[in-house]
């Protein structure tokens, strides 16, 4: 769960003007200007791929434009470029030496935390937060390339292979906002052949609609939520959480449009599936699908432990550490992992014990038909009621985990006590429910 993917995002989402209309106008102008700058890069490299330039020139162009992009969007341009390339050089050197991909990932996380400590000592916490999202995405790409190089089982990497990895790592349109794409997805996107004008026009229209919806959600996050007068503390907490989610949706929909313009069909996030999710497990997986794919493929599926619970905990721990030393993000992600795990275990137990289609994930679909062997299928009244209960509970968990992202410490980072204090106003209810689910799963 992170929306700090743009160095200027916090500035974009500041409330402007004295009225909702003034605020909406200025936020729309600010977000549109930033997106237009990124769209220039998108269309530039869309054309570069069509020119079929020599590999050396194309790789040089990727690296040069990435350097300029990092400098353009960063407050301290020279320092940011040096830091960005330091991560790259260390990781690529280790990858070429066939160092284990997990060691490279761990090394990058340690470098990220070390950088945060240096910035903290220099009273530059705000600068680190502007750069953190860029570096987090960069680390994910570097570690993905490292895994691919190590798994290739070749003694030495050819120049053509190396240039392709470098193009993947240094792809300017995805440097600031993202999204994360796997190496295979990048290759498919790069090699896509556009055969019809109607196809390109359809993609342009769909992407434009996504950007329009994203900007609308950014306006809701920055203006309408702040101007609304809550009638109770719970409503205020719900609005705070909704503001956080709307800013996240703005990023996700915008980056999905970028990828779509370049020929990729990846889905970054579907707000409807998050707001009305079947379970907390679905909320977690739908929150940022590419990020979930990265963690699922590179951490969870490797099964470092025999226990599923420990593998879930490790996955969320790595997710938290990718945000550096951010206590609020650590607590939020680990809390989501615990909540999702306990609910999944409990619902599986109910589904097995009473033969009801109420598991955290719905039964599988084959040939457009749902394969359900439960006595009480998904449209049974009792099943509908139980699934509705868990959907409402997932909505509450979104409020519980999102209400801590207030504006108080957004620019410098949240202290450890902040999260616990706000959760305490709800009597740690999500945790109590989760512990109850674990206990009941043993009793039933």
From Swiss-Prot:
Query: What compartments host this protein?
Result: Membrane
Q: Detail the disulphide connectivity of this chain as listed in its UniProt entry.
A: none
What's its catalytic activity?
[Wnt protein]-L-serine + (9Z)-hexadecenoyl-CoA = [Wnt protein]-O-(9Z)-hexadecenoyl-L-serine + CoA
Membrane association type: Multi-pass membrane protein
Q: What class of enzyme is it?
A: transferase
Domain of life, per UniProt, equals Eukaryota
Q: Name one GO cellular component term.
A: endoplasmic reticulum
Summarizing the function annotation, the protein's role is: Key regulator of the Wnt signaling pathway that mediates lipid modification of Wnt proteins. Acts as a protein-serine O-palmitoleoyltransferase that catalyzes the attachment of palmitoleate, a 16-carbon monounsaturated fatty acid (C16:1(9Z)), to Wnt proteins. Serine palmitoleoylation of WNT proteins is required for efficient binding to frizzled receptors. Has a role in cell specification, specifically in blastomere signaling. Involved in cytosketetal polarity. Required for the orientation of mitotic spindle axis.
The family line of this record is:
Belongs to the membrane-bound acyltransferase family. Porcupine subfamily.
Q: What is this protein called?
A: Protein-serine O-palmitoleoyltransferase porcupine
């Amino acid at each position: 769960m992170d929306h700090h993917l743009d160095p200027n995002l916090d500035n974009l989402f500041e409330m402007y003007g004295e009225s909702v209309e003034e605020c909406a106008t200025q936020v729309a102008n600010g977000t549109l200007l930033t997106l237009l700058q990124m769209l220039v890069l998108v269309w530039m490299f869309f054309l570069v791929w069509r020119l079929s330039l020599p590999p050396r020139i194309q790789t040089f162009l990727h690296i040069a434009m990435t350097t300029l992009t990092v400098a353009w969007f960063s407050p301290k341009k020279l320092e940011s470029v040096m830091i960005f390339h330091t991560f790259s050089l260390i990781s690529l050197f280790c990858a070429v030496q066939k160092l284990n991909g997990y060691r490279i990932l761990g090394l990058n996380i340690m470098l990220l935390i070390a950088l945060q400590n240096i910035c903290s000592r220099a009273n530059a916490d705000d600068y680190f937060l502007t750069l953190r999202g860029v570096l987090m995405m960069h680390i994910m790409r570097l570690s993905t390339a490292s895994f691919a190089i190590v798994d290739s089982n070749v003694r030495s990497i050819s120049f053509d292979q190396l240039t392709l990895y470098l193009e993947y790592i240094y792809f300017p349109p995805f440097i600031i906002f993202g999204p994360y794409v796997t190496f295979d997805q990048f290759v498919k996107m790069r090699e896509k052949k556009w055969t019809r004008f109607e196809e390109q026009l359809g993609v342009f229209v769909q992407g434009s609609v996504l950007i329009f919806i994203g900007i609308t959600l950014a306006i809701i996050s920055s203006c309408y939520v702040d101007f609304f007068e809550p009638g109770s503390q719970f409503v205020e907490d719900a609005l705070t959480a909704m503001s956080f989610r709307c800013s996240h949706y703005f990023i996700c929909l915008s980056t999905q449009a970028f990828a779509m313009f370049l020929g990729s069909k990846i889905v970054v996030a579907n707000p409807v599936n998050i707001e009305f999710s079947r379970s907390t497990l679905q909320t977690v997986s739908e929150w940022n699908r590419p990020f979930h794919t990265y963690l699922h493929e590179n951490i969870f599926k490797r099964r470092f432990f025999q226990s599923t619970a420990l593998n879930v905990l490790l996955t969320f721990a790595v997710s938290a550490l990718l945000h550096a030393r951010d206590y609020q993000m650590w607590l939020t992600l680990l809390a989501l992992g615990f909540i999702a795990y306990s609910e999944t275990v409990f619902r599986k137990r109910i589904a097995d014990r009473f033969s009801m289609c109420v598991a955290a994930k719905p039964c599988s679909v084959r040939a457009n038909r749902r394969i359900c062997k439960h006595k009480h299928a998904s449209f049974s009244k009792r099943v509908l009621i139980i699934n509705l209960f868990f959907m409402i509970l997932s909505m509450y968990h979104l409020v519980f985990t999102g209400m801590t992202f207030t504006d108080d410490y957004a620019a410098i980072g949240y202290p450890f006590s902040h999260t616990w204090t706000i959760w305490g106003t709800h009597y740690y209810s999500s945790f109590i429910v989760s512990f109850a689910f674990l206990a009941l799963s043993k009793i039933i």
